[in-house]
Amino acid sequence: MDLMDMDAINDLHFSGHSSLTNTPTSDEDYGCTWNHWSPIVNWDTFTGAPDDFHHLMDTIIEDRTTVLEQLSPSITTTTTTTTTTDEEEEEMETTTTTTTTAIKTHEVGDDSKGLKLVHLLMAGAEALTGSTKNRDLARVILIRLKELVSQHANGSNMERLAAHFTEALHGLLEGAGGAHNNHHHHNNNKHYLTTNGPHDNQNDTLAAFQLLQDMSPYVKFGHFTANQAIIEAVAHERRVHVIDYDIMEGVQWASLIQSLASNNNGPHLRITALSRTGTGRRSIATVQETGRRLTSFAASLGQPFSFHHCRLDSDETFRPSALKLVRGEALVFNCMLNLPHLSYRAPESVASFLNGAKTLNPKLVTLVEEEVGSVIGGFVERFMDSLHHYSAVFDSLEAGFPMQNRARTLVERVFFGPRIAGSLGRIYRTGGEEERRSWGEWLGEVGFRGVPVSFANHCQAKLLLGLFNDGYRVEEVGVGSNKLVLDWKSRRLLSASLWTCSSSDSDL
């Protein structure tokens, strides 16, 4: 299996300009220094030294380089192993006792306070729904919760987590639940926007994203796994066309462009990003700006590259006929869903994209999605499973940056608070009946075939996790071992799976 040229990777720096280029033009001439992508973060406002952090794109490339440096000598000497435990994944039960023991309540000063918070949260959820619905009781419970919890940086994990769930329950009580449903979650946190100006909100969002990259493998795990699979799938192609469902700032594609550029005979890369008319000109302008930056970056490395965008319909439906296709291109569909920094996308929109992929017979479909619990029940059961899930997330963030209290709090406030509110709002409106199946399962049922994760890709994922706290682990599961799952201890957090259409099997 071909890996990227390590000498070329080691020569590549994004601190100001790249020393690896096939053209005499500097990065500055193209206006593509990756530092311009990174937020200007006032690290003095966070505890800890500024040197604990790196610029956004520097971090991505450096982590990719570190992983591959470790991976290269091990390909022929290492056997594939997947860390397993004798314990089954812990399932949430509907009783108070089993639920509270599943939630992390350590380091709260007094474990009884953590247990009390869990009991009160469950009671609040019960008071809002079902046969015991009592809005007056719910209001009293929430008042008590607000006296006990704190989103302050010095609050414990359980206190901060309970604060976000309390805010979400309060939104449901006041009829505002799910306000984050159909839009970018961090731009629709009404409380946040009323206490911070739009400019401050944008800066905090960028800073929070950079911090999330430094604190956890949540973003890089999916990006690196998908990119490595793409590199392997198109190794002998002359032209590659990637259709990206949710490109955002395009940070995923820096390492792919870099990898292709390190191969003198690499293919021409074309990326088509989907834009959403429902969010107005800002969405389209953001996609176009992303395209300009990626184009400049590719040019600085001498990588043949072109960028296009394709508008979704007003209801965010994808129409394959809207794509500009070129004969002979190897098609790749890339779908990142429900990651901490991404917007919620309606199931109908996602289904239209994946159905459209099937009609175009792509070489590869890369899917990264949040792992959901297999809880069967109504709102209360789903509420407690969500509490269990985010308890694991908060625990992992604290383990990654134990001394950076204010940094963690910013990430939690900008990304996870609105995400919790939006998720619970959707569950509440549907009575807990919101679709829970994974999109990977759906792909298998509609005729897609799993593509096995390569040994190199699996090793890369494990080595990436080695850069973070040892509580993370990776599992290889799925149809024909086509799926890698990122776990925090016993809780599955997100997965990356690889697919192709049955009719294209012979091409792989």
From Swiss-Prot:
The keyword Membrane applies. Induction: Induced 24 hours after treatment with Nod factor or Sinorhizobium meliloti. GO terms for cellular component: endoplasmic reticulum; nuclear membrane; nucleus. Residues 289-321 are annotated as: Leucine repeat II (LRII). Residues 425-500 are annotated as: SAW. Residues 75-98 are annotated as: Disordered. It comes from the Eukaryota. GO terms for molecular function: DNA-binding transcription factor activity; sequence-specific DNA binding. Residues 209-273 are annotated as: VHIID. One of its GO terms (biological process) is response to symbiotic fungus. It is found in: Nucleus membrane; Endoplasmic reticulum. A motif (VHIID) lies at residues 240-244. Expressed in roots, shoots and leaves. Residues 331-422 are annotated as: PFYRE. Residues 115-190 are annotated as: Leucine repeat I (LRI). Keywords: Endoplasmic reticulum, Membrane, Nodulation, Nucleus, Transcription, Transcription regulation. The keyword Chloroplast does not apply. Residues 108-500 form the GRAS domain. Transcriptional regulator essential for Nod-factor-induced gene expression. Acts downstream of calcium spiking and DMI3, a calcium/calmodulin-dependent protein kinase (CCaMK). Transcription factor involved in the control of strigolactone biosynthesis in roots through the activation of the beta-carotene isomerase D27, which participates in a pathway leading to biosynthesis of strigolactones. Interacts with RAM1. Interacts with IPN2 and RAD1. Belongs to the GRAS family. This is Protein NODULATION SIGNALING PATHWAY 2.
